[in-house]
């Protein structure tokens, strides 16, 4: 009698535990599906912009919850575009007063000194991905007006030195090409009421041989710090042509 009671009691406990696990999984799946349906913002034509992968959704949530976010991943994951989209949304809402866009002037051996024209003309080719996001959300004409008024500021990373960026949404793109000193300088510009997003691809470093990437070092040093989120995306988050994922896999030695 006691054995039978004990057996049924244990069986009931096992059934309850399994039910709880199934319910937990169901709840998580349901929650993830809801996240896909959640609107990030609308573009300049009123069309809804949503996350296209789970990695992108987690990335957006990280920007909502943290003042400093690292978005790391290969080409095509939307890490830069989504950062700009979210920055534009915060500007629209009045959560920030301006957007500051920057990136290091290191691209496959080139430097700004060898490019023609004034500062804007020199910087523009390096910031094209950032412009694309702004034009999508705000429209080309409004983006240009905001740049002219200084609400959107676009500058090389070197121009960040000595500044404190309050009430701003600051994006550092191509951060894998920063040095240790540049990354430290940039991160310490964070002011009150501001958010920073640092994007980069650790497999696409164009720094001179022997120079360590400031992005790699920052990820190691700042992992686990409260208020900082390090979001790593992979080929499953690539939303470009299907061949892009295959190319990334081959170059990274993944079959």
Give residue ranges: language-model regions.
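Generic preference for hydrophobic/aromatic residues in regular secondary structure cores
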Residues: 32-33, 39-40, 60, 228
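Conserved adenine-nucleotide phosphate-binding loops and their immediately adjacent elements
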Residues: 36-48
